[in-house]
Amino acid sequence: MKVQEGLFLVAIFFSLACTQLVKGQHQPGENCQNKCGNITIEYPFGISSGCYYPGNESFSITCKEDRPHVLSDIEVANFNHSGQLQVLLNRSSTCYDEQGKKTEEDSSFTLENLSLSANNKLTAVGCNALSLLDTFGMQNYSTACLSLCDSPPEADGECNGRGCCRVDVSAPLDSYTFETTSGRIKHMTSFHDFSPCTYAFLVEDDKFNFSSTEDLLNLRNVMRFPVLLDWSVGNQTCEQVGSTSICGGNSTCLDSTPRNGYICRCNEGFDGNPYLSAGCQDVNECTTSSTIHRHNCSDPKTCRNKVGGFYCKCQSGYRLDTTTMSCKRKEFAWTTILLVTTIGFLVILLGVACIQQRMKHLKDTKLREQFFEQNGGGMLTQRLSGAGPSNVDVKIFTEDGMKKATNGYAESRILGQGGQGTVYKGILPDNSIVAIKKARLGDSSQVEQFINEVLVLSQINHRNVVKLLGCCLETEVPLLVYEFITNGTLFDHLHGSMIDSSLTWEHRLKIAIEVAGTLAYLHSSASIPIIHRDIKTANILLDVNLTAKVADFGASRLIPMDKEELETMVQGTLGYLDPEYYNTGLLNEKSDVYSFGVVLMELLSGQKALCFKRPQSSKHLVSYFATATKENRLDEIIGGEVMNEDNLKEIQEAARIAAECTRLMGEERPRMKEVAAKLEALRVEKTKHKWSDQYPEENEHLIGGHILSAQGETSSSIGYDSIKNVAILDIETGR
């Protein structure tokens, strides 16, 4: 174990040593010469081995006659840390004597790991002078400039192509040999007096100003011009070198823009050589003479230096104006008064706002409680608790939730309007679609009906009854929330906007069976018997599969187990209203049977329950239907789209059932259990005939030929009773 710990410590030691070695090998030695004449040589440049950055001879400086030279023969005029080197390069010239004899001088130089900066210009001086720059490397590059004149140019100092021209230089980075050539495209002896020579040279921007005739004559005495060369450390980016860069403390590594590699720069507030480990030193902006780092405090006495910057400190009783960076006397009295007044005013405003918010909250709470009682919330709670166990969980929705769901009760969301109020389409936060029924404003009778509807629906859990999801009693009028049924009402399909939906006889029989089964369940199998009291086609909804959903239980009544009828105020819809109930005010399950009989007649005939366009004796569909049946004119009121040769007997049987349901005396009407069983028997018989027509041999084998051939009462009654028993069993189960 001790051996392993020892090895681990040794590994750490070597790692640290290697790191220091990497850092140390990029620093100059202690005894390096840093002067050549009057010019200071700064790292990464150096005069001798070990004094410049290793691996790049472009950083090696040769000191000749107290003048520094890079790449042996290019004189350096100035060093800087920003990745540029100012050097002096010879010009090229072509001169003519009075006889026209030509003398030429060309200039060429080689750059290895340095490159020509874009901050230089190729310049030509002279009349009809041509300046040409050729570069050689992986790619050869040439650029030229032409200066024209036939007389001395005006002395305006402009290098605009007359006697002088200049162009930008953008040589490829891989160029290593450069050559400037001067020439004259057409020599004239008249030029000799004012432009005997033409000159071509590279020069740093703004380092040469054309002086017309003086330069044309005297430029022969100027042999070299300042030129900028770009340099960088290595050929990797800052990200690639990471912590191994030679940038010292308080400096930043920057990727070289014109070429590969990187350069270093002292951070803001520091100055010095960023390539040395401690080269960047804090600048005292308060005392420095440098215009770059000098402070901007209006009074130097207020300047205070800090590491990497400065600040202006005013004496007690004064404040700093950041616009002018000067100290101004504090106005204590007015400032204090204004501050205290503002804070006091804000505190008062905040207190008033809090009180108003609290009062509004109390008012809203009281108003919601008032609406809750006004909308029968207490009565509903009392009745629900006294009605026995509920089969449905009734959710309480908030007023804000209902507003959002209906988009503020927008007219575009209205699904329908009727005696029980207005029904809106609502979208809940979970994107589920619901139907929201809103009672009419100012109609107190609606409250009782809404409470009654919640009370009734809380006792029902049936697949053919529209499901109550919840209610909202916090609003001025109560709201009920139901599941959304998408395919309209049966009335719409028979008489309204969806009359072209072409309900077949199979669809109509299915709807009749589902409605009859639902009523039978309400009358006989619900935990407390329920009479709907307003069965009509407008209260029967259809989903996309044409499954019937009985809705609108606002007029419904719960019948105590020990009673068969209730004495109530007559309520219902003309055309569907039981005449016996209308005359006596006694409500029982046979009233729903009558209303269902009218619905069945509508399904058979497609006629409205009450139509004033028909003759007086036939405006009620029950009378119209009874007369047609009695006179054997049933085919006149039942259209061809419903009745045909295949279903004639079924139509006649259904018509007979409808007639039984609408008898004047309630005791002569069948119970809904029986009606549902008879209609179910029609569907089973129809299915049996279809199957026997398709598979006659199998039918005879399974059922027995003697039963199929029997025509007596016994055989048919046995089949009917069996079917009826199955249907009744299905009704009683509800789901």
From Swiss-Prot:
GO cellular component: plant-type cell wall; plant-type vacuole; plasma membrane
Modified residues (Phosphothreonine): T398, T568, T573
Annotated binding of ATP, by residue: L415, G416, Q417, G418, G419, Q420, G421, T422, V423, K437
Stretches in topological domain Cytoplasmic: 353-735
Domain EGF-like: start-end pairs: 234-281, 282-328
Alphabetized InterPro entries for the sequence: EGF-like_Ca-bd_dom, EGF-like_dom, EGF-type_Asp/Asn_hydroxyl_site, EGF_Ca-bd_CS, Kinase-like_dom_sf, NOTCH1_EGF-like, Prot_kinase_dom, Ser-Thr/Tyr_kinase_cat_dom
Matches recorded under CDD domains: EGF_CA, STKc_IRAK
Compartments, as annotated in UniProt: Membrane
Superkingdom: Eukaryota
Active site residues per record: D534 (proton acceptor)
Function recorded in the entry: Serine/threonine-protein kinase that may function as a signaling receptor of extracellular matrix component. Binding to pectin may have significance in the control of cell expansion, morphogenesis and development. Required during plant's response to pathogen infection and in plant defense against heavy metal toxicity. Phosphorylates the oxygen-evolving enhancer protein 2 (OEE2) in an GRP-3-dependent manner.
UniProt record similarity statement: Belongs to the protein kinase superfamily. Ser/Thr protein kinase family.
Record's subunit section: Interacts with the glycine-rich proteins GRP3 and GRP3S, and the type 2C protein phosphatase KAPP. Component of a 500 kDa complex, composed of WAK1, GRP3 and KAPP. Interacts with the oxygen-evolving enhancer protein 2 (OEE2).
Annotated protein name in UniProt: Wall-associated receptor kinase 1
Species in which this protein is naturally found: Arabidopsis thaliana
The encoding gene: WAK1
